[in-house]
Amino acid sequence: MRSLRALLVLFAFVFIVVLTPALRSQAAAASPKTPSSPQLVIIDTDIGDDIDDAFALALALKSPELEVLGVTTTFGNTQMRARLVDRYLKAVGRSDIPVLAGPETKTGNLMTQAAYAKRDPERKFGDGAEFILREARQRPGQITLIGIGPLFTVEAAIKRDPATFKKLKRVVIMGGSVYRGYGLNTQGKPKPAEPEWNILNDPPGLKALLSSGVPVFMMPLDSTQVPLESQGREAIFAHGSALTDQLTLLYHEWTGGTPSHSPTPTLFDPVAVTYTFRPDLCPAKQMHINVDARGMTSPGQGSPNAEVCLQSDEKSFLDLLLKRVTAD
C-alpha cells in the first residue's frame, strides 16, 4: 500500500513539474496572440465629407490594440474638420486625444457634416504637420501614421523635416486604384483602375511619401469598397452608446448633404485602420507603384516602394467592425 501511495505521489510530482508547463505552452500557442502593449498611431483624416472617416475613427477608438496619440486633419477647411473631431472626441469621453489641423487647401468640395462641426466652439487648432514630426522625434520607430485623406498634411511634414519624418515606424494609407476603379460596370464587373479621390487631390503627396524612406502600406480601391448595408447600420444606430450616437448624427447629416448618393456607406477608411492590427484581413504584397499627374497609381517595374492589399476579407472585416463599434 505504501509503495502504491509513493507511486501516486511521484506521478503527481511529474505531472506538475513536467507536463503542466507543456500544456500551458500548447494552450498559449492555440490562442490568438495579443500585443503586450498597444501600437501608437496618429490618424490624419479629411473627416466631414464622406462618412467612412467617422467609422474609421470609431473603430480606432474601440480597438485595444491601438493607442491614438492624436488626430490631424487634412484637405480644404482643416480648422472646421478639427472642430468636428474635437466635438466627436469630447462626446465619447476622449478629450484627452489632441486634435490638430493640417494646411488648408482650396477645394470646391461640400463638407456635408459642417453643421455638426459648428456646434463645437470655434478656436484655433495647432499645426498638424508639426505634431506628426514632434511625436516621431520623441518616439522614433514607434509610431504608425494612418492617412485616410488626401496627403497634404503628410506631404507638409515630409517637406518640413524629411529626416524626422523617417523616424515613423510606417505609414498606412487608404488611397490609390491599382487594377480596380469605383463600383461596377453595367455587366456587374469591377470598373478598371481610375484616379482615386485621396490621390487625385494630391498626386505629389503620394510621390513624396513613396520616396520618403518610411515603409508604406496602401489600401486601394481594390480592397476597400466594403458596403455597410442596412442591417449593419441599424445595429449601430440602435445601440445607443455615446459613440454610436455620434455616428448616427453624422450619418444622417451625410445622407442629407448628399441626397443623390446611395444611403449605403462604403467603408474605405476603416479597412486601413483594421490593417494596422489585423493585417491578415487584408494581406499586402510588395509592389512598385507609379503615380502620374492625374493621380493614377499603376504597378510598374523597379524596386518595391509599397506593400499593397488588393483583396480584403470583407465578411470578417465587417464582423469585427460591428462587434467593436457596438461593444460597451
Pin down the residues of each PLM region.
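Positively charged n-region of N-terminal signal peptides that target proteins for export
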Residues: 1-6
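Signal peptide processing junction and immediate N-terminal pro/mature segment
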Residues: 20-32
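Short, mixed-charge aromatic SLiMs
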Residues: 78-84, 177-181, 291-305
